[in-house]
């Protein structure tokens, strides 16, 4: 079956024909039957250079031999026990070693679960209910953070989805990214805030990078107001380097969430942080968290294999940075947009200057992006189908795939 026919069938049994809205490419999505390295093979017989990489987890590319070997070995030993394993201890110790701010952690199954649990933990630890997030900040599709982007910086939240009770959404406040003054003003007025959760680098609208001094100001402000600081590093964790954005920018949050690369491309989420906070997690404390697939052996094995590989080949981060630099340098002189990159994350905004926050990112010409996306796909390069999703490179992007990508951006 070809993609168009598959989509017609999918709409009879899947809402909108897909399992996640971003995949609903118009007029119909292409369907992938296999992937290796940096290449997707579609049901239509096409080969595409992948600049999505599963929306971030595949730093080493599709079906990397070291990860595949670890998964196959664990399959032979069984893939779910319902008991503790040495694997979860091993991965936890590695993550704690890589992140000085993380003294204890809990492995869950998704980044969404990790942010949900971190917010619950912050509320339990502080005894306060309010949460602050960024305008446009995305932390998974759960009620505490599904709040409409762009509402006033110091107003209560408005539900961004049917089914979210307004009374629940009202516990969430928003401030703009790169605006420490707005955060200070809010926390000075509202003394019922448990935590401020943010992506240190906004990955779900860009990327959008922090101004010099912004993250350190956020750390000082939250400390001054006795508000916990949660870094959502589901995207940036192990993507911008071992130790994530918190190491790169020299910030020590109270809690951190991880996912994606941490599990080697298998389902995983992690929340961790200060020991005195984490000891409140059940069964040692009163903040409940549980899950059938928490710490599942397959994800632990893939995560360990990834961690080992990254430590043995840490120079790959500099090599990936050079690859995105090459894309940036390929842009034609007539290009009127802005190119933003950080290591292996990059995006071309159809906007004259790089955005500093979500509202500025929204000013991008989405119609022009759509034309660019469709041309790139026609030319054999798959980029995320939204102006507001980050592009990702992997170590598997070799000279041939880079040549294709650069050819696309030379004609932006």
From Swiss-Prot:
Origin superkingdom: Archaea
TM ranges: none
Catalysis: reaction(s): (S)-4-amino-5-oxopentanoate = 5-aminolevulinate
Keywords: Cytoplasm, Isomerase, Porphyrin biosynthesis, Pyridoxal phosphate
Cofactor: pyridoxal 5'-phosphate
Pathway the protein takes part in: Porphyrin-containing compound metabolism; protoporphyrin-IX biosynthesis; 5-aminolevulinate from L-glutamyl-tRNA(Glu): step 2/2
Gene3D superfamilies assigned: Aspartate Aminotransferase, domain 1, Type I PLP-dependent aspartate aminotransferase-like (Major domain)
Name of the top EC class for this enzyme: isomerase
Annotated localization: Cytoplasm
Record SUPFAM superfamilies: PLP-dependent transferases (SSF53383)
Alphabetized Pfam families for the sequence: Aminotran_3 (PF00202)
InterPro entries associated with the record: 4pyrrol_synth_GluAld_NH2Trfase, Aminotrans_3, Aminotrans_3_PPA_site, PyrdxlP-dep_Trfase, PyrdxlP-dep_Trfase_major, PyrdxlP-dep_Trfase_small
GO cellular component terms, A-Z: cytoplasm
GO molecular function: glutamate-1-semialdehyde 2,1-aminomutase activity; pyridoxal phosphate binding; transaminase activity
EC number(s) reported in the record: 5.4.3.8
Residues found modified as N6-(pyridoxal phosphate)lysine: 260
Primary site of residence: cytoplasm
GO biological process: protoporphyrinogen IX biosynthetic process
Entry similarity comment: Belongs to the class-III pyridoxal-phosphate-dependent aminotransferase family. HemL subfamily.
NCBIfam families the UniProt entry points to: PRK00062.1
Stored HAMAP family: HemL_aminotrans_3
Protein name as annotated: Glutamate-1-semialdehyde 2,1-aminomutase
């Amino acid at each position: 079956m070809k993609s168009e026919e598959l989509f017609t069938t999918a709409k009879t049994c899947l809402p909108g024909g897909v399992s996640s809205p971003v995949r609903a490419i118009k007029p119909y999505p292409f369907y992938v039957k296999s992937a290796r390295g940096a290449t997707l093979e579609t049901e239509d017989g096409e080969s595409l250079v992948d600049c999505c990489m599963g929306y971030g987890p595949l730093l080493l590319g599709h079906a990397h031999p070291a990860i595949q070997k670890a998964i196959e070995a664990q399959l032979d030993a069984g893939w779910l026990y319902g008991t503790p394993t040495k694997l979860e201890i091993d991965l936890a110790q590695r993550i704690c070693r890589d992140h000085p701010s993380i003294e204890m952690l809990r492995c869950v199954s998704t980044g969404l679960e990790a942010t949900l649990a971190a917010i619950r933990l912050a509320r339990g630890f502080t005894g306060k209910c309010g949460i602050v997030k960024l305008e446009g900040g995305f932390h998974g599709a759960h009620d505490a953070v599904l709040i409409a982007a762009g509402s006033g910086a110091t107003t209560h939240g408005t539900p961004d989805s049917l089914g979210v009770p307004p009374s629940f959404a009202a516990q969430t406040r928003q401030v703009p990214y790169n605006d420490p003054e707005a955060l200070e003003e809010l926390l000075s007025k509202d003394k019922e805030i448990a935590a401020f959760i943010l992506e240190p680098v906004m990955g779900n609208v860009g990327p959008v990078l922090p101004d010099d001094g912004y993250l350190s100001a956020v750390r000082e402000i939250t400390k001054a107001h006795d508000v916990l600081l949660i870094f959502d590093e589901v995207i940036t964790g192990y993507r911008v380097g071992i130790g994530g954005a918190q190491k790169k920018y020299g910030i020590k949050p109270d809690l951190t969430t991880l996912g994606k690369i941490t599990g080697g491309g298998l389902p995983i989420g992690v929340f961790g942080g200060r020991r005195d906070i984490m000891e409140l997690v059940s069964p040692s404390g009163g903040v409940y968290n549980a899950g059938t697939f928490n710490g599942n052996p397959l994800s632990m094995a893939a995560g360990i294999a990834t961690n080992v590989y990254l430590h043995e080949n840490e120079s790959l981060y500099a090599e990936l940075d050079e690859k995105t630099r090459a894309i940036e340098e390929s842009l034609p002189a007539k290009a009127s947009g802005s190119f933003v990159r950080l290591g292996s994350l990059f995006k071309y905004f159809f906007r004259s200057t790089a955005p500093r926050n979500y509202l500025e990112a929204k000013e991008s010409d989405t119609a022009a992006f759509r034309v660019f996306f469709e041309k790139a796909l026609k030319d054999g390069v798959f980029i995320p189908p939204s102006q507001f999703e980050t592009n990702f490179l992997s170590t598997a992007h070799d000279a041939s795939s880079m040549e294709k990508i650069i050819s696309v951006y030379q004609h932006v």
